[in-house]
């Protein structure tokens, strides 16, 4: 049984070759066409010397060619490297070097950056350039145009046998440090992200053909992963569809109105988002309606919206539940180091304080500092941990591998640093990443919980919470806030709103107002940037109880 990503896609290709696999505005690619084009690119890469285990970078927005390239890389047992298209040159150089990349497939719009980085990354010998409507010159480094590479190569599927042990690498976002390459076996990542388990029960899919056969027997779902494919959640929404003969909508840019237009035009069934950063502009656009027709968007085919990997505030969920009655809205937990961890169904007005409250499967648990499971309903906070199908470690980073992948009581766990509370019914309420938690007066404060409380105020569009040095408390809980256009709010008003949702010691006591909150393309927070903002200038407002120290707002 070859539980390999390329094999699983090929099963669907063999059963539903005539179905549309990928669609973008004005263009569709069937499974048969996807097979031919991916085979051609795979043969081209092999002809250029790319061997099994070699690293191939994909530096692209959400395009059909990016998907073809991923599959081509897997077909020849090479390793795909996800390259963040917002990276500046020194960040690109880090990824190229750290991954030991030997080939690169990129959109033409990034040619200037590639030209500046390649002289310092001599391992990269092959560059394929995807036309994207721009005219940036790539002749300086001898890149070949994507369609030309395909035209000169074989369309046949005549590759060597693959293995479930082939390596898949997913680079983390790097918002709290350098990006790290998380190494998975193909079978393991399929089990926890690709449909190899039932996400509600944790039960294994036993037959490698099961997803393709079930998909062939039913009308294929139309899925629209909105986050960029550099993000693991978007990649695996894509592959879940390709394994089961579904149709995936690819769109390179994000805007609230574009999302609803695409759902309307393509009759989408399921969309995937990453929390508030995408949800807020989508909500605003949904409330405004279609600007071209003056009518609401037709969302009759949409039945589910799935959020993962970023804070999805209760107030945002409630607005969606009001505007999308009858639709299923889910919030999932997970990370590059654990894959899927648990899922919750949104319910109006339901919040226990913190992040999402989810039902976990038998492979996910919450451990105390000694590696023992936290008792449900104890009120204790512990580390989210996953066992079973987990990564091998970080690429070329033994120290961080030892820190994250630990053994307790003879069991190997992945413990990426997320903290949670186990409720009396066994569900888990996420609190946040320990590496960005704030220690204020001996109390640990998790930014996501505070951010969710601040976003309850109608004037707040986005917010990040960090700790700043404080002589009395060690760290002062502080907020960097972006307001909605035309809105104004005081720190006192923000504190009042937050205090109604969280304990007083968690309430921000200083605020910096900014035009826009910096996030990754996938919507993940950049806490280093937020911390920098607090050092660039004095706070716009600081709470002070009269002792000059800005004492804690205890309510």
UniProtKB/Swiss-Prot annotation:
- Where are the disulfide bridges? none
Cross-referenced PROSITE patterns: AMP_BINDING
Binding sites annotated in the UniProt record for ATP: 172-180, 418, 433, 524
Keyword Acetylation: yes or no?
Answer: no
Catalysed reaction, written as an equation? (25S)-3-oxocholest-4-en-26-oate + ATP + CoA = (25S)-3-oxocholest-4-en-26-oyl-CoA + AMP + diphosphate
EC number(s) recorded for this UniProt protein: 6.2.1.42
Q: In which pathway does it act?
A: Steroid metabolism; cholesterol metabolism
Residues covered by region (Disordered): 525-555
Gene Ontology biological-process entries: cholesterol metabolic process
Entry's Pfam families? AMP-binding, AMP-binding_C
Give the UniProt keywords, A-Z.
ATP-binding, Cholesterol metabolism, Ligase, Lipid metabolism, Nucleotide-binding, Steroid metabolism, Sterol metabolism
Return the Low complexity bias intervals: 544-555
Under InterPro entries, the record lists:
AMP-bd_C, AMP-bd_C_sf, AMP-binding_CS, AMP-dep_synth/lig_dom, ANL_N_sf, ATP-dep_AMP-bd_enzyme
Q: State a single Gene Ontology molecular function.
A: acid-thiol ligase activity
Membrane spanning stretches? none
Report if keyword Ribonucleoprotein is assigned: no
Q: Tell me, in a sentence or two, what this protein's role is.
A: Catalyzes the ATP-dependent CoA thioesterification of the sterol 3-oxocholest-4-en-26-oate to yield 3-oxocholest-4-en-26-oyl-CoA. It can also use beta-sitosterol, campesterol and 3beta-hydroxy-5-cholesten-26-oate.
Query: Which family is this protein grouped under?
Result: Belongs to the ATP-dependent AMP-binding enzyme family.
Q: What is this protein called?
A: 3-oxocholest-4-en-26-oate--CoA ligase
**Which organism's genome codes for this protein?**
Rhodococcus rhodochrous
Organism classification, top ranks?
Bacteria, Bacillati, Actinomycetota, Actinomycetes, Mycobacteriales
The record's gene field reads: fadD19
């Amino acid at each position: 049984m070859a539980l390999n990503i390329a094999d699983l896609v090929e099963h669907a290709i063999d059963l539903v070759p005539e179905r549309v696999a990928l669609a973008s505005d004005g263009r569709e690619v069937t499974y048969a066409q996807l097979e031919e084009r991916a085979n051609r690119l795979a043969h081209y890469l092999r002809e250029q010397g790319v061997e099994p285990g070699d690293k191939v970078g994909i530096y692209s927005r959400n395009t059909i060619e990016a998907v073809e390239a991923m599959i081509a890389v897997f077909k020849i047992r090479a390793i795909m490297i996800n390259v963040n298209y917002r990276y500046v040159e020194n960040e690109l150089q880090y990824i190229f070097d750290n991954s030991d990349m030997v080939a690169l497939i990129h959109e033409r719009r990034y040619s200037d950056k590639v030209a500046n980085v390649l002289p310092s990354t001599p391992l990269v010998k092959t560059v394929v350039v995807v036309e994207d409507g721009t005219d940036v010159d790539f002749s300086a480094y001898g890149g070949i145009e994507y369609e030309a590479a395909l035209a000169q190569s074989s369309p046949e599927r005549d590759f060597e046998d693959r293995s479930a042990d082939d390596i898949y690498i997913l680079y983390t976002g790097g918002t709290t440090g350098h990006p790290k390459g998380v190494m998975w076996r193909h079978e393991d990542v399929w089990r926890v992200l690709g449909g190899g388990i039932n996400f509600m029960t944790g039960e294994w899919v036993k037959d490698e053909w099961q997803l393709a056969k079930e998909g062939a027997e039913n009308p294929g779902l139309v899925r629209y992963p909105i986050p960029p494919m550099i993000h693991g959640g978007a990649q695996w929404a894509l592959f879940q569809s390709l394994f089961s003969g579904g149709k995936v909508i690819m769109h390179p840019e994000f805007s609230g109105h574009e999302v609803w237009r695409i759902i309307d035009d393509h009759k989408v069934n399921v969309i995937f988002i990453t929390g508030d950063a995408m949800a807020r502009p989508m909500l605003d656009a949904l409330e405004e309606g279609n600007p071209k027709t003056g009518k609401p968007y037709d969302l009759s085919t949409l039945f589910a919206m799935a959020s993962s990997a970023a804070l999805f505030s209760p107030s945002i969920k409630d607005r969606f539940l009001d505007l999308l009655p009858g639709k299923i809205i889910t919030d999932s937990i997970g990370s590059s180091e654990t894959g899927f961890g648990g899922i919750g169904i949104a319910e109006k007005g339901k919040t226990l304080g913190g992040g999402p409250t989810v039902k976990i499967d038998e492979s996910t648990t919450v451990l105390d500092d000694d590696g023992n499971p936290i008792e449900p309903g104890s009120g204790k906070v512990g580390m989210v941990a996953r066992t079973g199908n987990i990564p091998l470690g970080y690429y070329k980073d033994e120290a961080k591998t030892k820190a994250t992948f630990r053994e307790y009581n003879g069991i190997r766990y992945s413990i990426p640093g997320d903290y949670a509370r186990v409720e009396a019914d066994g569900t888990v309420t996420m609190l946040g990443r320990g590496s960005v938690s704030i220690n204020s007066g001996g109390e640990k404060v998790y930014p996501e919980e505070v951010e969710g409380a601040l976003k309850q105020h109608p004037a707040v569009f986005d917010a990040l919470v960090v700790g700043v040095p404080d002589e009395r408390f060690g760290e002062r809980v502080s907020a960097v806030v972006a307001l909605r256009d035309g809105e104004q709010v005081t720190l006192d008003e923000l504190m009042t709103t937050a205090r109604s949702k969280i304990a007083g010691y968690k309430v921000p006591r200083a605020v910096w107002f900014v035009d826009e909150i910096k996030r990754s393309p996938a919507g993940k927070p950049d806490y280093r940037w937020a911390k920098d903002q607090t050092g660039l200038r004095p706070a716009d407002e600081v709470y002070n109880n009269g002792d000059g120290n800005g004492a804690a707002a205890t309510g």
